[in-house]
Design a protein with these regions (language model features):
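N-terminal non-cleavable signal-anchor helices
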Residues: 11-13, 17-19, 39-41, 62, ...
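Beta-strand-centric surfaces of beta-sandwich/beta-rich domains
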Residues: 27-204, 211-324
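Short amphipathic alpha-helical segments with coiled-coil-like heptad repeat character
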Residues: 2-3, 218-222, 416-418
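Extracytoplasmic copper-binding redox domains, predominantly the cupredoxin/blue-copper superfamily
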Residues: 324-424
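Secretory targeting and sorting signals
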Residues: 2-26
Length: 424
């Protein structure tokens, strides 16, 4: 077998000297891998987990990015089949912020197309015997079934020890396969909703680079060091770019600002780091995320050392777009009044047109073989259920009158429901 498992080697750069101390030569390779084929039916979303190929010799990942390609290797744009998000993990290795999970998350990318690139002299250690896996969510905006592949390009250094980095995953809803939450959207114009997650640093080091991930309605991700009383980095969304049609979800940022620093942001053992996700709260935003992945080079840090200048890939940040997502299929069937719930089968809701009184606690009973959910598209208050299969239930109490338009986020063109909540 070749030194790299079943990969397409697209370029081998000239050997370069990196690291600290006496100059040495390291072979830096640009390697291209592909996942297995993923088939997505029209106007549906799909999630997949898979073991994937990785470098089969010991070395260091110094950069990585991902996209979707067709069978000929052509890039598939977001307006056709969207790489909504993809997470790469090293199977069997403990995760930094979710140590009970034996899958170390070391890179992720979404609609914002973040590409990780470490400063010279640093790398994410990888053994030839390590195994990689991915979790991907794709959305097909086309009327036909399409098969695509996740292509990931890895910059890989061998032949010399680099200073190792550790990936730190900060997440508003950590340690879940689908770490979403909902912004209710019940505030006045200009109001915001903030959610926070804290991490007490178990070791000292320097943060060399970081990128963020948000969904529609996102305003900013703020990484701060509460021990030192300072903001370390703010990742801001950009919204300029083509909007995939038809809309299968609220459009997310086309870019999130990221930073890189060869000196690194100093953090000391015991420091309380906080990531704050800020969303618009003037209208509902469902199934949102607030995630940042940062790369730490462990080293001694004495207290609250000065933060160096950062090289920031800013983009063109601005306020989130206000785009109403329509129901792609009109709910049908008789109007069901004052019922307390309904069933959810494969690709349909039992009662699609419902009228209930304010204060009703409504329960969806899942009976399908495949995962489905209940997600608000537009309405007075944002809410959603987890992906659920047969035997599961989800309940919501309607406290505000109005029209609630719902769909299954995995099958938005096939599964729709409208619930009218009356005052009396």
């Amino acid at each position: 077998m070749a030194p790299i498992r079943r990969l397409a080697l697209v370029a081998v750069a000239a050997a370069v000297g990196v690291g600290f101390g006496p100059a040495a030569e390291a072979a830096v390779q640009t390697l291209v891998f592909k996942s297995g084929p993923v088939t997505v039916t029209p106007y549906d979303a799909i999630t997949r987990t898979a073991l994937i190929d990785s470098p089969a010799v010991d070395g260091y990942v110094t950069g990585i990015k991902a996209d979707l390609v067709d069978g000929s290797g052509n890039v598939v744009p977001n307006t056709q089949v969207m790489l909504h998000h993809v997470v790469f993990a090293k199977i069997g290795a403990p995760d930094y912020t979710c140590p009970g999970t034996r899958a170390q998350r070391f890179f992720a990318e979404g609609e914002e197309h973040y590409a990780m690139s470490l400063p010279k002299g640093y790398g994410y250690p990888n053994k030839g015997s390590d195994h990689w896996g991915l979790l991907a969510m794709l959305m097909n905006h086309l009327p036909g079934t399409h098969t695509v592949w996740v292509r990931y390009t890895v910059t890989y250094a061998t032949g010399e020890p680099l200073s190792p980095v550790k990936p730190i995953w900060l997440d508003m809803n950590n340690c879940k396969a689908d770490p979403i939450y909902d912004v209710p959207g019940t505030g006045a114009a200009g109001s915001t909703s903030a959610r926070k997650v804290d991490l007490t640093m178990p070791e000292s080091g320097r943060l060399l680079t970081a990128g963020g991930h948000m969904h529609g309605g996102g305003i900013k991700l703020v990484l701060s060091d509460r021990t030192c009383g300072r903001t370390l980095f703010t990742s801001q969304p950009s919204w300029n770019g083509p909007i995939p049609l038809p809309l299968l979800h609220e459009p997310g940022p086309t870019k999130m600002s990221s930073f890189q620093s060869p000196l690194g942001i100093p953090v000391a053992a015991g420091d309380d780091l906080r990531l704050t996700a800020v969303y618009d709260n003037s209208r509902p935003h469902t199934r949102v995320m607030g995630i940042m992945i940062a790369y730490l080079a462990p080293t001694l840090v004495a207290g609250c050392e000065p933060v160096p200048g950062l090289t920031i890939d800013l983009g063109t940040p601005g306020p989130p777009t206000n785009i109403a997502v329509p129901l792609l299929q009109k709910p049908s069937g008789p109007l069901r009044k004052n019922i307390k719930g309904t069933w959810v089968g494969d690709y349909t809701y039992g009662a699609q047109r419902v009228s209930v009184k304010r204060g009703t606690r409504f329960t969806w009973r899942f009976t399908g073989t495949f995962p489905h959910d209940v997600t608000l598209v537009t309405g007075p208050v944002g809410f959603s259920s987890p992906w659920t299969t047969s035997g599961g239930t989800f309940s919501h109490t309607f406290t505000r009158p109005g029209t609630y338009k719902l769909f299954c986020s995995l099958h938005p063109a096939r599964m729709t429901e409208v619930i009218q909540v009356r005052k009396k």
